[in-house]
Amino acid sequence: MRTILLTIAYDGTDYYGWQIQPDLPTVQGEIEKALHRVTGKEIHINGTGRTDRGVHAYGQCATFRIGDGIPTDRIAYALNNSLPGGIRIVSAEEKPEGFHARFDAKGKTYRYRLLLCGPHEDADGAPQAQRQLLYLRNYVYQVNRPLDLAAMRKAAAAMEGTHDFACFQAAGGEERETTVRTVYRVELTERCLEEGFFPEEESAHVLDIDVTGDGFLYNMVRIMAGTLVDVGSGRIGAADVPAVIESADREKAGHTAPPQGLYLMRVYFEEDFGHGEE
């Protein structure tokens, strides 16, 4: 039997998250159905992360066991021919026996994308950002107020390091032995989606929040992103963020940013964790 590691990209808009749910479309469910069509066998896959409904991925990973038959270098091609358009297998590689996508993961990078409110209006007097949201609404969190990016970067720096991140954990997730995690990097990058992306001659400004850590609590990145937005809008002081973390009190942190702005960018394993970016 071979152990196969898949790297997977998907648009989470039409799926009820990663994990299989009865009678609902999920990413895991679609991949397992594709595996059955390709191999004729019932094959269970184990994902690194259980992304929620509406969350996207560029670099989700999953492992499964398979016998002889389809060559490893043909698995991605075969599955992509059987999968819906919103799910793509980026790569498939054979790993040593016992390798597990979840338990052997050493870290992840997530990206949270904000659509910043545009200052200009079009000929009809409608803000450009409102029109842009028609095309981006499933992939960004639109923020309709100015943000103090310097304050947000100061707060982001306070989120780095090894801490008890209970303040950034939502209720309802899987029970954890500890809420202590190490966040290696929280980086904010302004980007412009250039003219030509939209039907009209306009561009969109986005702010990407990239978070790399050894593990994450339930909704942790979305709450971190919401907290940074609250810092940027003045609802939480940047200097108060260390005390918020120290409190371990969810009520003291910011709001939970919506799912559609979140992307799982990369999973790190022993051989590559800490040696690259997303």
Task: Give residue spans per PLM region.
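Structured-RNA-binding interfaces characteristic of tRNA pseudouridine synthases
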Residues: 1-278
